[in-house]
From Swiss-Prot:
GO molecular-function terms, A-Z: ATP binding; ATP-dependent protein folding chaperone; unfolded protein binding
Organism: Desulforapulum autotrophicum (strain ATCC 43914 / DSM 3382 / VKM B-1955 / HRM2) (Desulfobacterium autotrophicum)
Compositionally biased residues, Acidic residues: 620-629
Designated name of the protein: Chaperone protein DnaK
Gene responsible for this protein: dnaK
Alphabetical list of Pfam families matching this protein: HSP70
Comp. bias (Polar residues): 600-610
Lineage summary: Bacteria, Pseudomonadati, Thermodesulfobacteriota, Desulfobacteria, Desulfobacterales
Region (Disordered), start-end ranges: 597-637
Upregulation: By stress conditions e.g. heat shock.
PTM-bearing positions, type Phosphothreonine: T198
Length: 637
């Protein structure tokens, strides 16, 4: 049985870990890094790049380099979050036929789940290279405040990447596993997780291997990307003041600004001031323009003051929902790269009236927790019980457009709950079940997860039929809904997938495309290897001919030169088999030259040995030799 890996699929960076000798171990990628940028690019030549290689070329290929896709996953195109992102992202965001979000790369639409699958496939390969075996199963983390469609889309991404997702686990919960695995006493902790694109806060009780989530809250569209945007706007405004040019319309310049903003933000976690220098950022009639802006930590904090304020309410709500106060909390664990920012740490200390715990690596702790959960599922980790909760209330729309809740937020999962409803009109032949997720009283203010109908109801006065609606949330936080007419036993059910926008057929096609792409990658690799071998062979043959061509007859030399020319003609082509065939032909033709060289070397070696033996051969008088020898011996005596 292969290993189940733990994956933190992050907005900015992703990380993978596995259980080894009872401990979670983070796996380094091919470049020796412990995290991989969550960036995907499509080059002009049609090559797909993932990770650091994609990030490196972002400045020259901004429209076809996707970052922060986690903020788009499972969302409709007309949602305010997508409409806001559309204005600031350099790549094209479009609507699909059913209103879902799509990313256009070089004329082809991709779903956010598909883009995420490219990142997961890259991580899968990293794990396989390390483990030396195929990896087919994973535990993947998501923000605790992800709704059903976002969870389902993440699961779809895993499937497209060739992974069976054994469990979707909340990021703060995963972090608590890594933090508290060895803790013996009971503790009440808060996991404060501010990452690249999302914010979560969870309150947990941990002790003796039991990890019970009491409440969770957050914002799935608040993170480091938002802080970066504030810095980008500030730099662009300062440049416009000094040069009179707004560089935000230049996508290449904007990408340079993004990188500079990210770097400045990181530097200001340890320094109080930084210089942002971008030479040749743009040009006008007077010549090239250079950007040079100073940014202080105090200025940065003023730029993001409202974002820092937005961290407070979810924390207060989470404490209230858990029935606790800040004085009840033993530790506040910081997770996510953004928690390195001093202003964030100060705000956390102010909210919870205690200094936060910094003993875990905020970039790796979530992946390590996912690996521990993978170990639990695999049977390698014992005495660990994880009790997570659903982050949002679930219900259906009832008469008057009201949302009637069946499962309240922060209910421990898995869970199942039923409630009986009836018809609103006489002889109503069908009922429409509108499944909702959210906290608003009216249906219109909540997220639609899906709709289905229970039909062929027998004619009856209003209020008489008994329709039992059952909500079932599995351990992944994914919802299943069923409706049953108690009189006839007729039942209709739905596994909520509509909002993720990917049907089983679409997922199957993407899986096939991913497998095809893997084959294409293999073929490209073979072609590159064949070309490199051919190049090396041509160079070596021409060098050898130049130095030793006179050692073979004219016919052999001509045959070698002809084979060399044949290989030169095909080596720039795209058929690896033909290049290999012509390389083999040149190798065979060159054998005669090699034989001639060795024969000549052997002859020369033989002549040298013969010349060394001649003096001995000439002096065949044994007595003379003995006498000389004896004389020396006598003299010595």
């Amino acid at each position: 049985m292969g290993k189940i890996i733990g994956i933190d699929l992050g907005t900015t960076n992703s990380c993978v870990a596995v259980m080894e000798a009872g401990e979670p171990k983070v796996i380094t990628n091919s470049e020796g890094n412990r995290t991989t940028p969550s960036v995907v690019a499509l080059t002009e030549g049609g090559d797909r790049l993932v990770g650091q290689t994609a990030k490196r070329q972002a400045i020259t290929n901004p429209e076809n380099t996707v970052f922060g896709v986690k903020r788009l996953i499972g969302r409709k195109f007309d949602s305010p979050q997508i409409q806001g992102d559309k204005k600031v992202l350099p790549y094209k965001i479009e609507a699909s036929a059913n209103g879902d979000t799509r990313i256009n790369l070089r004329g082809k639409q991709h779903s956010p789940a598909e883009i995420s699958s490219f990142i997961l496939a890259n991580i899968k390969k990293t794990a396989e290279d390390y483990l030396g075996e195929e990896v087919t199963e994973a535990v993947i983390t998501v923000p605790a405040y992800f709704n059903d469609s976002q969870r389902q889309a993440t699961k779809d991404a895993g499937k497209i990447a060739g992974l069976t997702v054994k469990r979707i686990i909340n990021e703060p919960t995963a972090a608590s596993l890594a933090y508290g695995l060895d803790k013996k006493g009971e503790e009440k902790i808060v996991v404060f997780d501010l990452g690249g694109g999302t914010f979560d806060v969870s309150v947990l009780e941990i002790g003796d291997g039991v990890f019970e989530v009491k409440s969770t809250n957050g914002d799935t569209h608040l993170g480091g990307e938002d802080f970066d945007l504030r810095i980008i706007d500030y730099i662009a405004d300062e440049f416009k003041k000094s040069q009179g040019i707004d560089i935000r319309g230049d996508k290449m310049a904007l990408q340079r600004l993004k990188e500079a903003a990210e770097k400045a933000k990181m530097e200001l976690s340890s320094a109080v001031e930084t210089d942002i220098n971008l030479p040749f950022i743009t040009a006008d009639a007077s010549g090239p323009k250079h950007l040079d802006v100073k940014l202080t930590r105090a200025k940065l904090e003023s730029l993001v003051a409202d974002l820092l304020d937005n961290l407070v309410a979810p924390c207060k709500t989470a404490l209230k929902d858990a029935g606790l106060t800040s004085s009840d909390i033993n530790e506040v664990v910081l997770v996510g790269g953004m928690t390195r920012m001093p202003a964030v740490q100060e705000r956390v200390e102010k909210i919870f009236s205690k200094k936060p715990h910094k003993g875990v690596n905020p970039d790796e702790v979530v992946a390590m927790g996912a690996a521990i959960q993978a170990g639990v599922l695999q049977g390698d980790v014992h005495d660990v019980l994880l009790l997570d909760v659903t982050p949002l209330s679930l219900g259906i729309e009832t008469l008057g457009g009201v949302m009637t809740k069946l499962i309240d937020k922060n209910t421990t999962i898995p869970t199942k709950k039923s409630q009986v409803f009836s018809t609103a009109a006489d002889s109503q032949p069908a009922v429409s079940i509108h499944v909702l997720q959210g906290e608003r009283e009216m249906a219109a203010g909540n997220k639609t997860l899906g709709q289905f109908e229970l039909t062929d109801l027998p004619p009856a006065p209003r209020g008489v039929p008994q329709i039992e609606v059952t909500f079932d949330i599995d351990a992944n936080g994914i919802v299943h809904v069923a409706a049953k007419d108690k009189a006839t036993g007729k039942e209709q059910s739905i596994r909520i997938t509509a909002a993720s926008g990917l049907s089983e057929e679409e997922i199957k096609k993407m899986v096939n495309d991913a497998e095809l792409h893997a084959d294409e990658d293999k073929k490209k690799h073979e072609l590159v290897d064949a070309k490199n071998t051919a190049e090396s062979l041509i160079h070596q043959t021409e060098k050898t001919l130049k130095e030793h061509g006179d050692k073979v007859d004219a016919a052999t030399k001509t045959a070698i030169e002809a084979a060399c020319e044949e290989l030169k003609k095909v080596k720039e082509g795209t058929d690896a088999a033909i290049i290999k065939e012509k390389s083999e032909a040149l190798t065979q033709a060159s054998h005669k030259l090699a034989e001639a060289m060795y024969q000549q070397a052997a002859q020369e070696s033989g002549q040298t040995e013969g010349a060394a033996q001649d003096p001995k051969g000439a002096a065949q008088d044994d007595d003379v030799v003995d006498a000389d020898f004896e004389e020396v011996k006598d003299h010595k005596k």
